[in-house]
Amino acid sequence: MPFVNKQFNYKDPVNGVDIAYIKIPNAGQMQPVKAFKIHNKIWVIPERDTFTNPEEGDLNPPPEAKQVPVSYYDSTYLSTDNEKDNYLKGVTKLFERIYSTDLGRMLLTSIVRGIPFWGGSTIDTELKVIDTNCINVIQPDGSYRSEELNLVIIGPSADIIQFECKSFGHEVLNLTRNGYGSTQYIRFSPDFTFGFEESLEVDTNPLLGAGKFATDPAVTLAHELIHAGHRLYGIAINPNRVFKVNTNAYYEMSGLEVSFEELRTFGGHDAKFIDSLQENEFRLYYYNKFKDIASTLNKAKSIVGTTASLQYMKNVFKEKYLLSEDTSGKFSVDKLKFDKLYKMLTEIYTEDNFVKFFKVLNRKTYLNFDKAVFKINIVPKVNYTIYDGFNLRNTNLAANFNGQNTEINNMNFTKLKNFTGLFEFYKLLCVRGIITSKTKSLDKGYNKALNDLCIKVNNWDLFFSPSEDNFTNDLNKGEEITSDTNIEAAEENISLDLIQQYYLTFNFDNEPENISIENLSSDIIGQLELMPNIERFPNGKKYELDKYTMFHYLRAQEFEHGKSRIALTNSVNEALLNPSRVYTFFSSDYVKKVNKATEAAMFLGWVEQLVYDFTDETSEVSTTDKIADITIIIPYIGPALNIGNMLYKDDFVGALIFSGAVILLEFIPEIAIPVLGTFALVSYIANKVLTVQTIDNALSKRNEKWDEVYKYIVTNWLAKVNTQIDLIRKKMKEALENQAEATKAIINYQYNQYTEEEKNNINFNIDDLSSKLNESINKAMININKFLNQCSVSYLMNSMIPYGVKRLEDFDASLKDALLKYIYDNRGTLIGQVDRLKDKVNNTLSTDIPFQLSKYVDNQRLLSTFTEYIKNIINTSILNLRYESNHLIDLSRYASKINIGSKVNFDPIDKNQIQLFNLESSKIEVILKNAIVYNSMYENFSTSFWIRIPKYFNSISLNNEYTIINCMENNSGWKVSLNYGEIIWTLQDTQEIKQRVVFKYSQMINISDYINRWIFVTITNNRLNNSKIYINGRLIDQKPISNLGNIHASNNIMFKLDGCRDTHRYIWIKYFNLFDKELNEKEIKDLYDNQSNSGILKDFWGDYLQYDKPYYMLNLYDPNKYVDVNNVGIRGYMYLKGPRGSVMTTNIYLNSSLYRGTKFIIKKYASGNKDNIVRNNDRVYINVVVKNKEYRLATNASQAGVEKILSALEIPDVGNLSQVVVMKSKNDQGITNKCKMNLQDNNGNDIGFIGFHQFNNIAKLVASNWYNRQIERSSRTLGCSWEFIPVDDGWGERPL
């Protein structure tokens, strides 16, 4: 069903219903205007806006243009009936295009439902419409009636391309910011759109970016509609809350204050400029405003000015604000419902998300100040359709967004030139002491007698330099921790899957009816919306500099197109002082070839060679082994843009290696992270439960602190670093285009020197030449983008994250001392729990929380670069064993030869997991290239691998050290060996002096993190310092090795159990790496986190969790209990039973019994999963095995209370009961593989995570939404954390 009620024509006769003359608030003496009601609560006025604000009624250009990138004035636009008809049809077409998407249908329904709150009465027990939320509709008989509305679309005011969303009045009440909301009008035109450079954004397809692209006007309208949604629901951010920029330096953009409201509406990583502390402030503020509205509704006893009933209007606002209502009719704000509504309005509804649904190309940042404007006509279907926009299917415009390409689809786009009232806001950059005569640097109209070389630089081409005032920093504030301290749920990244979940649960019914409003005054008057005061900056400010800047280098590459000959030069100075010279950063050979005059007979060969050389020059890349996370360098970026502090040596690569990515930054960001605020722990005398809960809350709040600091750093990185990188990206595109233009001009000049007869013999096409040069530029931009992205991520990971981690580690150390003292002080209350809690505190606070960029941004370009950054660490390895293409191979650049014995076993599910037995034929031999055989007393090296060591079952294993990885020759080298409860690293020099570093673990423990479980081992060796062993990213032991002399290792690495007395012994190993450097702690943690494969769920041992495989269950809150079934059927239940009991052998092991209780089997929900592996967010069924028969885990969601008791039902009997489970991974440093199971109803609504609840001292399994609210509590404090335990030979227990 379409959104627009019917097809309207401007000349259709008025009927007083959906076509009428209307008067809007604050219109004064205006004549009524013809308007069209395209949908309930939404009108369109195809007129220029000369009446909403008396001060904006003049359509002529103002005497002083606005401080914006571009303005456009044309007083004749939208003055004829044909233009108005086209406007009306264009607007309605865009509404249909928006409504055709799931996201657009949700947004428009929210707008229609967003009736401004009736807070117009001075009596607090009375509801009354606010008059400025109404219009007066002229009836055919000349009378009028008043009608409430939500939105008006109206033509632009004087500046045709200033699209904006505003309120009609009563802004003195702050309606758009107090939860009430107010009627909105949007100044908009479907007849104009803006350009942007695309190839700056796409990294993989050189066919894209052949020129400038045009924004789909549906995206522009959607952006303004999102503003309208914010303002209708009263959650718009105060316009005075802005993102400020510095303005003092020559390179800094002036006069720009981007409102937080605009950043939030755009979404994407721009929204991350608003740091989490400020965002939390906004969320809490509006939560309280919604509570005020609920309170007002509860007080209301009457309604005036309408025939609608009080109860009807209360229901309208209940639907709008998603209020809860109890049996007495009292309204309240449910925090979960509020969070969902607020998230939808502010994070789901964004321009960035609409781009994904429209499947169009778009600017990647709100800070896109492109000055290109195009006239368009979207009404004809041959130009633009509801489903495709400009990129018409079944035409050449469908591929590569060609429909938006203003050069390919040039019939649809008329670029506006010679703007009336175009205002150029600029800075004047002057270099002292250069005497100028006739130079290109002095723009027309400037004094030619200046002794300084000066250039004009448009303000919007300068660096976006954010002020420190933008970043709130409350991280140093202390906090009191109690047993009921609120733990914030983790924010879920916005994905298409999440939006689809919102869509599936969105209520599209109950659209509010038109209600009768008593006639208001014929001229509705309210206070006009106040606009923020924007500080004005002087135009043309002059800066005297001592050296050329990036902008001088770019100006030196420009030239005036004319009939005179130009020539390339490698001298910036010459190019700036001589209008006929153009600076190039290409080689001197290229300069000689392009500047050389050519005879007609040689012309085509000359052109072909120049195109080839141009491609060769732009394709130039360098590589270095000295920077692990930057794999390619574009050496000409330095001389192209004057970047790098070693350029006087023409060595940009050297400068990068010497200084790192910081050389790209014009201003170095400062991140002021203070000493983090401490926790004050509240004591509870003689209350064990509350004391334990306080400790748990402190650990959970510690996790929040890490998250806050990471968010804060990412916000600073995006705003301060990535914006600079993006400007360099843009300027490099301009620089390459300048080179292409100069090359074309020289070739064209040469062609025009020939006689007509000579030209006739030359088959030359300037457009074909342009196409070839553009293709070379676009291919070059792929490498440039890759390099710049790597530099940006490198700066984040090497200069910013470590600084934050150091602050956090100091905080952890302080908290650890406080918690251990708290446990000691309350030891009398914590009887039986002291040791467990101390271990928990020590383990939690000894482990850093790995940084994952995907938690904080959803920009795929940056995320893929971050992933590549992790992989680059592996790429520094000189041996990297992986199973690929049915072979075990070395993925390092050395490709070592590998010999595999006949008794080596590869796991069928993950063939990287290799099983070695205690057999002569069970071995792997790696033959190293001579270049990487270790033979040194100074060079550092590291190794890493994952290992699973089965339990030691008998005394034969005591005091039996055996080697598993051996690189020794002539009693010199290194090896890895095992002993009962030990992993041992040995280094031995040629004089047989050795050093050992050992990790020890116990087999006398109930539930071990190490017995038969995958462990990540890293050993680093700094020859002038220590050898260190890390387990799961944590430093365990270190010993000095500076006393060792030369170590000459073998050229063979042997993986084999050597010297083991137990003939039944075996091990599992995977992901072996050898590095020719000392890995630092950050690299170890990054490598560990990446190889943990957190997107795949793991079982108790660390293997991949599988479908159709039986598992025993371990609840991490109460690990001494197991799951049992009371009875099958809807009246039966499952529960935790205990204790587990023990399995033991004297002096060898003493452990809890793991194979106890009911077995669970995970079944596929849909057939889309091609393998048998369970992944994060998989939707599954859970079967329960009772007496060798499978039953389905399910619940009746209509049960009273939050906790829904789970039952084991006959599978055919499940019917409409809730049975779908969403699997969630919770990877705790790769040791404990926690899983959470979120039960949903048949509509996809969350019932809650599966845990347990005490009913009459029986711990019954339930699905509870309480867990969903507390999900970020520390791992062992919630009953919804589970581990799946399969039977495994390495554990040695006989299943019951």
Curated annotation (Swiss-Prot):
Q: Which UniProt keywords apply?
A: Disulfide bond, Host cell membrane, Host cytoplasm, Host cytoplasmic vesicle, Host membrane, Host synapse, Hydrolase, Membrane, Metal-binding, Metalloprotease, Neurotoxin, Pharmaceutical, Protease, Secreted, Toxin, Transmembrane, Transmembrane helix, Virulence, Zinc
Q: Which residues lie within the region annotated Belt?
A: 492-545
Q: Where does Zn(2+) bind?
A: H223, H227, E262
Q: What is this protein called?
A: Botulinum neurotoxin type A
| Transmembrane portions of the chain | 627-647, 656-676
Q: Where is this region: N-terminus of receptor binding domain (N-RBD)?
A: 873-1092
Cofactor(s) of this protein: Zn(2+)
Q: According to the UniProt entry, how is activity regulated? A: SNAP25 proteolysis is inhibited by 1,10-phenanthroline and 2,2'-dipyridyl but not EDTA. Inhibited by hydroxamate compounds with halogenated benzene-containing arms which directly bind the zinc ion.
Q: Where is this region: Translocation domain (TD)?
A: 449-872
Give the cofactor binding note.
Answer: Binds 1 zinc ion per subunit.
Concerning Pfam families, the annotation shows: Peptidase_M27, Toxin_R_bind_C, Toxin_R_bind_N, Toxin_trans
Q: What is its EC number?
A: 3.4.24.69
Report the catalytic activity. Answer: Limited hydrolysis of proteins of the neuroexocytosis apparatus, synaptobrevins, SNAP25 or syntaxin. No detected action on small molecule substrates
Gene name, per UniProt, is botA
Show where the record puts the motif Host ganglioside-binding motif.
Answer: 1264-1267
